[in-house]
Curated annotation (Swiss-Prot):
Subunit structure: Part of the 30S ribosomal subunit. Contacts proteins S9 and S11.
Cellular component, GO annotation: small ribosomal subunit
Record family assignment: Belongs to the universal ribosomal protein uS7 family.
Function description: One of the primary rRNA binding proteins, it binds directly to 16S rRNA where it nucleates assembly of the head domain of the 30S subunit. Is located at the subunit interface close to the decoding center, probably blocks exit of the E-site tRNA.
Protein name as it appears in the record: Small ribosomal subunit protein uS7
Record keywords: Ribonucleoprotein, Ribosomal protein, RNA-binding, rRNA-binding, tRNA-binding
Any one Gene Ontology molecular-function term assigned to this protein's record: rRNA binding
Matching Gene3D superfamilies: Ribosomal protein S7 domain
Source domain of life: Bacteria
NCBIfam families (UniProt xref): rpsG_bact
Pfam family, one: Ribosomal_S7
PANTHER family, A to Z: RIBOSOMAL PROTEIN S7
């Protein structure tokens, strides 16, 4: 890691169907081995399934799901003397989004539906209704931060 300059953030282009930057980031996270067209078909297929099931805008369901999964606080390890403390810290907005996307995808991959499109749509629907393993992951992180609130004065 360079000590002089931190890498500058790259501009992410909005996706062609919805014109949304977050959807593009989501696609890029789903993508394996540079196969963007496969990732695109999975995401768009999942959003089409959501639209068919709920009769409401798939973008609103997606945004609600992401909002319900994004953590506001997390714990980070801090060594003080000989002891390591789990110190609760607030999560930056870019990291919140990245963690939310990562947790949604991990939860979708762990589901039992047949295709990834079905798994992703089911997980997004669950997350938008505050259910599912991605939301559980966020609650676990928040519980951990709440349990270690006593060490919040070690914040840096």
């Amino acid at each position: 890691m360079s000590r002089r300059h931190s890498a500058e953030k790259r501009e992410v282009l909005p996706d062609p169907k919805f014109g949304n930057v977050v959807i593009t980031k989501f696609m890029n996270s789903i993508m394996y081995a540079g196969k963007k067209s496969v990732a695109e078909s999975i995401v768009y297929g999942a959003l089409d399934l959501i639209e068919a099931k709920t009769k409401q805008g798939p973008l609103t369901v997606f945004e609600q799901a992401l909002e319900n999964v994004m953590p506001t606080i997390e714990v980070r390890s801090r060594r003080v003397g000989g002891a390591t403390y789990q110190v609760p810290v607030e999560v930056r907005s870019t990291r919140r989004q990245a963690l939310g996307i990562r947790w949604l995808i991990t939860a979708a991959r762990g589901r039992n539906e047949k295709t990834m499109t079905e798994r992703l749509s089911a997980e997004l629907l669950d997350a938008s209704n505050n259910r599912g393993s991605a939301v559980k992951k966020r609650e676990d992180v928040h519980k951990m931060a709440e349990a270690n609130r006593a060490f919040s004065h070690y914040r840096w």
